[in-house]
Design a protein with these regions (language model features):
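N-terminal lobe of the biotin/lipoate ligase/transferase fold
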Residues: 1-101
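Long, positively charged amphipathic alpha-helical accessory segments at protein N-termini or as interdomain linkers
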Residues: 78-105, 116-195
């Protein structure tokens, strides 16, 4: 993965970027980094997670045979900020809508899921702590790019409506959208969430 275009996006210009083939959980990896005294903001992308999870510690199913976009990043937000998981959902929805005109059946499910038609497309897990009057968030995102083999799960995938979108294209579009909306006020973000 080439992160050179993402490094130019203002919000992410001071982040370090890592691409790992396999890991337990990108959220856990970023959280561990935030505890170090020489902490530098980071975005970590994984091809496969063995211990990925969602809200309420629900297991995030990823397959080596199916392609998913799985990444986590750190962000400092003001204490009065709109919830980061909602901003993440709005940014991912905006990124997908910007890449494909076939997104009319894409919707956000409270509080942290993206759905396409009647299947879960992905989710956002945010873990936060307050440090020096700011919220330090670790935002983890998992999006199904292609279909997963477990048919017992009610899932959908990006390739159902936009087969041209790869995880590299979607990651860049998400980062651009996050950078665009992160400092919107709550009224503007609420409107985007409802739309």
């Amino acid at each position: 993965m080439n992160f050179s275009d993402i490094k130019k996006i203002p919000f992410f210009k001071n982040h370090i970027f890592e691409h790992v083939i396999e890991t337990g959980s990108t959220n856990d990896n970023i959280k561990a980094k935030t505890k170090k005294s020489d902490f530098i903001h980071c975005l970590q992308l994984a091809d496969f997670q063995t211990a990925g999870r969602g809200q309420y510690n629900r297991k995030w199913v990823s397959e080596k045979s199916g392609e998913s976009l799985m990444f986590s990043f750190s962000a400092e937000l003001p204490c009065d900020s709109f919830p980061a998981s909602l901003i993440g959902g709005i940014a991912m929805s905006g990124a997908l809508r910007g890449l494909s005109v076939n997104c009319k059946n894409l919707w956000l499910k409270w509080p942290n899921d993206l759905w396409y038609k009647n299947g879960k497309l992905g989710g956002i897990l945010t873990e936060s702590s307050i440090i020096d009057g700011k919220i330090l968030c670790v935002i983890g995102i998992g999006i199904n790019i292609s279909a997963i083999n477990d048919k017992s799960l009610n899932t959908s995938c990006v390739n159902e409506f936009a087969p041209e979108i790869t995880k590299e294209i979607l990651l860049k579009a998400f980062c651009e959208e996050w950078d665009k909306i992160i400092y919107y006020d709550s009224v503007a973000l609420s409107k985007l969430w409802r739309d």
